[in-house]
């Protein structure tokens, strides 16, 4: 254990659980650890976490850049983003009618609020303990509220279609895009989950696909950016792509993950569905 970490532990003990005023560097327990109950600090430069009486302070790494030094890209089919990613993503969500995608974590309140205004969504997240209400961690107020927000999101696959005023799954255009969607009581929620609980192999995708009211795919958002509050403090990147060829490939990937997805309040911590050639 390094001397700096030893000193930190002494500081926290001597101050009777009062956080040390020093900012220190230490790897968090999980590389992609997301928002917790204590993560709603609106300070733009520092967010504080309390974990097993060790106090973590995260500085906003975006502050290392004094200005946006990136050039405007003239290629209209792809746009890179490095700053204000939440703002740009919310703008794309607001313009869309339907949104689908695979996102490792969905905990950003502003993004969830934007998704609530859509005609319909279908988003797959990584399978986590807090999604199952029977797990101990899931009983925390923060996670109870988060699951309640998931339940309030509009389900694309059970909505009515704009173009034919019928069930969207009866729409010819929908079926041309998504093929024969298999729906059951196991995958009928707006937010689904895929993966294995407490396992390092994760459903680690980060992409959203946007559709207009006529079910025309208009763009895909992808990159390193997690849809979480803490990601706004990290150095992240994202691409917005309007190439129909590229969008079609992301739809294929969504459907592949969908086949092994279930409602977010999962019943089994193992992977849903059977693999033809499982590798261990």
From Swiss-Prot:
- Regions of compositional bias (Basic residues) in chain numbering: 1-10
Which InterPro entries has this protein been placed in? PLD-like_dom (IPR025202)
Q: Which domain of life is it from?
A: Viruses
Q: Where is this region: Disordered?
A: 1-45
Q: Which residue ranges have biased composition labelled Acidic residues?
A: 32-41
Show the ranges annotated as biased composition (Basic and acidic residues): 11-31
What's the name of the protein? Uncharacterized protein L381
Q: Which organism is it from?
A: Acanthamoeba polyphaga mimivirus
